[in-house]
């Protein structure tokens, strides 16, 4: 059976894993790293870069480098590169393609299916957008799974006794907290909460703001409008944040950060952990609000939690760990890798779907209440938040006016009492209702949430049996034709990448042959005739001229001709050497002399022998 990979599609970093021999294995990328930066960039010549290579060039190419695109999933945001507009789904698909390619290189086979994780607090539109990204990347997304739940799978796969655990997941761009009960292979989510606009990026931004303000006070120069300087500050801020998890102060030194009439300016600031904690204190507290709400929704007190799992790189921040410890009264469990455990959990879920992992049942929940707008702009909930999915719920409504022959079903997601303050998922019409006084027609609305957390809604006139069904697609989601177009674009990019690689291989091969030919001529010296030497030199010059151009076929042809000339001359020299070896009197290059005693076999006597055992 073909392998199904598990992917943690993160805001700042992504990770891919697979089940092998019953164990989840994290797949390293070609650079040798087990996580890949979620960065996409386009060079000025239009070449696409993804991952570490894209991140490395961000300082010199900030306007054409896309970071943290996950924060824009499910929105109508567009990235403009040379007049071409890319949706968040398309940019995310490029990251997924990179992970898919790395997995294929590791496995030695084509990968077409995946389980992809999303923040637990992702809306329906964001989940649908993630699924679309997978499709564009050439992946059938078998399941969308919540990140905290995936982390719990990674932790609890081999745990048999019952435990109540909290997964506190602070990633690069999102925050989630889930309360689960696990035991005997059953993983039941009791409650989940979160904030899709809170993550490590925000901690970085506080450091950037601090550096900008400090530099402005010292030099009078505002760096905010200098994109290259801001990119350098971003990298330095991220590095300082990481350092402050292990030391109490970090020196941020950026020479030549900018210049004015008096000359170049340098930034040199020392950031202490105490100052970092001070400027980010509200961010840490903002993670505790959903944490307390999730505990309340689960009906648990802190003493009932057996284990706290910290997930996401930002949970290494000491102030974050201290806040969690203070609230729950116990140290977090540190036996899982916060950067890899989500991908590992996704791989385990993939194993469940393929049958590689058995005896495991996952019961997840919907993070937000679902319902529709009713008379007066009220939000009427059909499915409450933290309901176990998949689930289905129906409720009967009626018309609001006499003679009404159609109704608009406005589907929403959220917790506010009034419809306008909740997230609109979509609208559809149920028509053909017989004219009747208001309140008489019976319209049954059914909400169905699948295991991916994606919503399907139907409305049925019980009087006529007339029914209308839709899978919710927000206005920000891509249509089927948009997805098909994006798939073709992705295939085109893949073909261009392949062609570019082939071009590099052809050029490298030509360079190698030039070096080999020139070295051989030098080493062989007089053994090569003047005509043959001239032929090789002519071929070398022809390849060098071809390399100056852009026509790959010309380079290939010149390389093949030089290769043939090289083979012909090598063969000729080999034959000459063999001829010298076969000359009986030759004792020169490759010649042989007769060994002493050779041919004197007349008086040879075969000696008898026996083995003597000294122990006897």
UniProtKB/Swiss-Prot annotation:
SUPFAM superfamilies: Actin-like ATPase domain, Heat shock protein 70kD (HSP70), C-terminal subdomain, Heat shock protein 70kD (HSP70), peptide-binding domain. InterPro entries: ATPase_NBD, Chaperone_DnaK, Heat_shock_70_CS, HSP70_C_sf, HSP70_peptide-bd_sf, Hsp_70_fam. Disulfide bonds: none annotated. GO terms for molecular function: ATP binding; ATP-dependent protein folding chaperone; unfolded protein binding. Residues 607-616 have a biased composition (Basic and acidic residues). Induction: By stress conditions e.g. heat shock. Keywords: ATP-binding, Chaperone, Nucleotide-binding, Phosphoprotein, Stress response. The keyword Zinc does not apply. Acts as a chaperone. Belongs to the heat shock protein 70 family. This is Chaperone protein DnaK.
């Amino acid at each position: 059976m073909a392998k199904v990979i598990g992917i943690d599609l993160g805001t700042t970093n992504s990770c891919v894993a697979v089940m092998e021999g019953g164990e989840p294995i994290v797949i390293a990328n070609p650079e040798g790293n087990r996580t890949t930066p979620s960065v996409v960039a386009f060079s000025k010549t239009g070449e696409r870069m993804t991952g570490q290579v894209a991140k490395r060039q961000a300082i010199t190419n900030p306007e054409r480098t896309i970071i943290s695109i996950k924060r824009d999933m499910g929105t109508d945001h567009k990235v403009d590169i040379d007049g071409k507009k890319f949706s968040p789904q398309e940019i995310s698909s490029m990251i997924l393609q990179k992970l898919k390619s790395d997995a294929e290189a590791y496995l030695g086979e084509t990968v077409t299916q995946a389980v992809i994780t999303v923040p637990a607090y992702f809306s329906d539109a964001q989940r649908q957008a993630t699924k679309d990204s997978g499709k564009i990347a050439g992946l059938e997304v078998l399941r969308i799974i919540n990140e905290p739940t995936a982390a719990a799978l990674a932790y609890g796969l081999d745990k048999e006794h019952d435990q109540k655990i909290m997964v506190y997941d602070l990633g690069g761009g999102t925050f989630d907290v889930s309360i689960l009960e696990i035991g005997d292979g059953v993983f039941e989510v009791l409650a989940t909460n979160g904030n899709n606009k809170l993550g490590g990026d925000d901690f970085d931004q506080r450091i950037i703001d601090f550096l900008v303000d400090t530099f402005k006070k010292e030099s009078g120069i505002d760096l905010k409008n200098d994109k290259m300087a801001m990119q350098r500050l971003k990298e330095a801020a991220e590095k300082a944040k990481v350092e402050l998890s292990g030391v109490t102060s970090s020196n941020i030194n950026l020479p030549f950060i900018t210049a004015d009439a008096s000359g170049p300016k340098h930034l040199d600031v020392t950031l202490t952990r105490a100052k970092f904690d001070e400027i980010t204190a509200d961010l840490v507290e903002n993670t505790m609000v959903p944490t307390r709400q999730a505990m309340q929704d689960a009906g648990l007190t802190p003493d009932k939690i057996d284990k706290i799992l910290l997930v996401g790189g930002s949970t290494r921040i000491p102030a974050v760990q201290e806040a969690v410890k203070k609230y729950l009264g116990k140290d977090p469990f540190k036996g899982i890798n916060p950067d890899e455990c989500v991908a590992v959990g996704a791989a385990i879920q993939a194993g469940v779907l393929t049958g590689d992992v058995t005896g495991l049942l996952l019961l997840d929940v919907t993070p937000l209440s679902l319902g529709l707008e009713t008379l007066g702009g009220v939000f009427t909930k059909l499915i409450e938040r933290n309901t176990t999915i998949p689930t289905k719920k129906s409720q009967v409504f009626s018309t609001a006016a006499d003679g009404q022959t159609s109704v608009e079903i406005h589907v929403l997601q959220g917790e506010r009492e009034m419809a306008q303050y909740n997230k609109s998922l979509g609208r559809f019409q149920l028509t053909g209702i017989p004219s009747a006084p208001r309140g008489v027609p019976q319209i049954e609305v059914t909400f169905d949430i699948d295991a991916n957390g994606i919503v399907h809604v139907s409305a049925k006139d019980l009087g006529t049996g007339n029914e209308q069904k839709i899978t919710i697609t927000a206005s920000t989601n891509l249509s089927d034709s948009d997805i098909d177009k994006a798939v073709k674009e992705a295939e085109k990019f893949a073909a261009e990448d392949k062609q570019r690689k082939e071009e590099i291989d052809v050029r490298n091969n030509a360079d190698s042959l030039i070096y080999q030919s020139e070295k051989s001529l030098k080493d062989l010296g007089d053994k090569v005739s003047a005509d043959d030497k001239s032929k090789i030199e002519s071929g070398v010059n022809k390849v060098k001229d071809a390399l100056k151009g852009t026509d790959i076929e010309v380079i290939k042809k010149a390389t093949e001709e030089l290769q043939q000339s090289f083979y012909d001359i090598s063969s000729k020299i080999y034959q000459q050497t063999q001829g010298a070896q076969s000359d009986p009197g030759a004792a020169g290059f490759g010649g042989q002399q007769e060994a002493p005693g050779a041919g004197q076999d007349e008086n040879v006597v075969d000696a008898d022998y026996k083995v003597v055992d000294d122990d006897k």
